[in-house]
Amino acid sequence: MSPVSTNDWVERRISLRNKHHLHMRPAQRIVETASRYQAEVRAVKDHLDLSAKSILDMIEFAAHMVNRASQDDNEFVFRARGPDAQQALDALDRLVEERFGLE
């Protein structure tokens, strides 16, 4: 098997399970977690493809997810590329699984 280029995107499908969906505190924790890694990390849903390292982008993303929550549509994708892309996605997956440490 050949190694994956650091320019290739790695994706992780995420399903929100916390009762309040995304709001300011989870958005902030996403930014804090993603910012620990060199990889470019993005949150993708519908027409949005936003930086997971930008609090303004994550607030916009959270607002979009809240609007989708009324339709029981709580899935989105984190994608990353760079030298530690897989580690960044693993950390974000753990963060979501732990419900952002808020429940």
Please report, for each region that a protein language model flagged, where it lies by residue.
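SAM-dependent methyltransferases
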Residues: 1-11
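Residue-level detector of functional hotspots within protein domains
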Residues: 8, 27-29, 86
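Non-catalytic helical/linker scaffolds that mediate oligomerization, partner binding
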Residues: 11-19, 75-79
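Compact, glycine-rich, soluble single-domain proteins
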Residues: 15-66, 71
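C-terminal structural segments of small proteins and small subunits
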Residues: 66-103
